[in-house]
Amino acid sequence: MIDRIASGFHPFVLPFLAGMFFVFGYCIFGVIKILLQLPRADRLQFYKSLVTPETAVKNVKDIFLNCLLHVKLWKRNPMLGFMHSSIAFGWFMLIVLGHVEVILFVPERIKFFYYPIFFNYFVAEADSTVQGSLLFFLMDFFLLVVLVGIALAVVKRFRSLIFGMRRTTRPSLLDLVGQYALWAIFPLRWLAEGFTAHISGGSFMTIPLNWIARQFLGNEFNMLPTWWAYSIALSVFMFVLPFTRYMHIPAEMLLIPMRNAGLHIRHARKGFARAEIFSCPSCGVCIDACPMSVKKSNLKDCTVYLNRHIRRGHEKRVDEISDKCLLCGKCQAVCQVGVEGPTLRIAQRATRRYNIEQDYSRIDVQPLTEAAMGSKVLYFAGCMTQLTPRIPRAMESVLKKAGVNYVWMDRDGGLCCGRPMLTAGKLGEAKQIIRKNEQIIKDTRAHTLILSCPICYKIFKEHYNLPGVRVIHHSQYLDELVKLGKLSPIKGAASVVWHDPCELGRGSGIYEAPRSLIGRCAELREAGNNSAESI
């Protein structure tokens, strides 16, 4: 391969360069803004993680698997996964192989940012080599992979049910501009490289196209408009990218190392939350998953639209959508990016200011009796369990049968775990309640706290500071008692379906203990939607 243009430049590359410099500048500014919004401790933690070998390897692995191969979508629907990964990974390989071509054949041109993108215009094939033929084949192969992905994307735009999606998001005008520009990029690249294949070489995709084109368009000047069109399509896509759903492409590459560094949402709009909001791909997978979406009027309140309105600064709609959520976490479970919809909503609620201040610091809770102070096991039923008296009565019976020395912490009433205040965004008030409960538990010197309510379990596990105290759900504790031989359930003929509670399953990752326990007592059958996708 040799240069056929001495200057190594043609004006048609200018639209591409303008778009590339714009999107690079925008992303660099965005990254700096997000990092500066992080608390100093989080920022230092993030920087440290980047130079930690284990975390660095995990970052590369996760970016490759999630940003290029879209493994989560493959697991959800193979056709949907193939569509996304063929475009992302195929485009990535075209860029990589383009750089390989420049380095191998015209290394002095690698300094030109645009050369690997428009390589076939600027070079001529002097003689055929094995290296060149292999690269031509690979370039055509990955171009075909991307074109297949684009074709599937066009089909999905009008027939999403084929890809397992009953509903998709409504695209904005700029989303449509970006989408059509993306769809145009690779057919135009195929045409452009096809027009020059008799000069720069090609393979099974470009050479046949070149032969057909030369039958009707013999003038070689006809090839230039296609290269202009290819460059302009790239430029349009990059100029609109920051203002469309496609911003998730660069944003997710920042979100992954931030998440692997152990960062969390601390503000509704800043820092880590901002990275999550811009990483939302607006694919609409969360719409079908949301239990509220069974009513058509609720479709506009799903997490994907919350992220969209936050990005656009539509404060009224953000407040409305933040309230219209059961916080079940199913949207987060199915999201390919892992956007924390419930946490974003709670953080948004926390930004509100109320005219009435609530102060729980003066609550005086009656301490447990002296007899309870020596008990090693505490049982906390919780507000919701108290509304179903059979549950705590059954727990009492079973614990006595197993000979467990326990105390029912909230038998005669007690403080709530703090969940209602937390989900309302009243974090200060919730902390006051939590501190009171912590003191009561610490005073008993108990080493185990059993909870029946999945909501209470998650709150105690994640928000309480109880060193030396094992927090456990009653299904786990009873399963342990059975395995230790302290309980001997008799298996009956009943057939039982277990519903995974949102807070116990998706929220806390406890799936096996309840099933193990039920399986010893009855025939266990699985529901259609279970485990992480339980309704």
What are the residue ranges of the model-derived segments?
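Iron-sulfur cluster-binding electron-transfer modules in prokaryotic oxidoreductases
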Residues: 97, 184-187, 213-217, 266-268, ...
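Flexible loop/turn segments at secondary-structure boundaries
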Residues: 95, 103, 194, 200-201, ...
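Short, charged low-complexity linear segments at domain edges
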Residues: 249-272, 297-316, 393, 514-519
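Membrane-embedded alpha-helical bundles of multi-pass integral membrane proteins
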Residues: 1-271, 287, 349-352
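Cysteine-centered iron-sulfur cluster-binding motifs in ferredoxin-type domains/subunits
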Residues: 273-294, 317-339, 501-503
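Non-heme iron-sulfur electron-transfer modules
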Residues: 258, 293-323, 338-363
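Active-site-adjacent structural elements in folded domains
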Residues: 219-221, 271-275, 308-320, 481-482
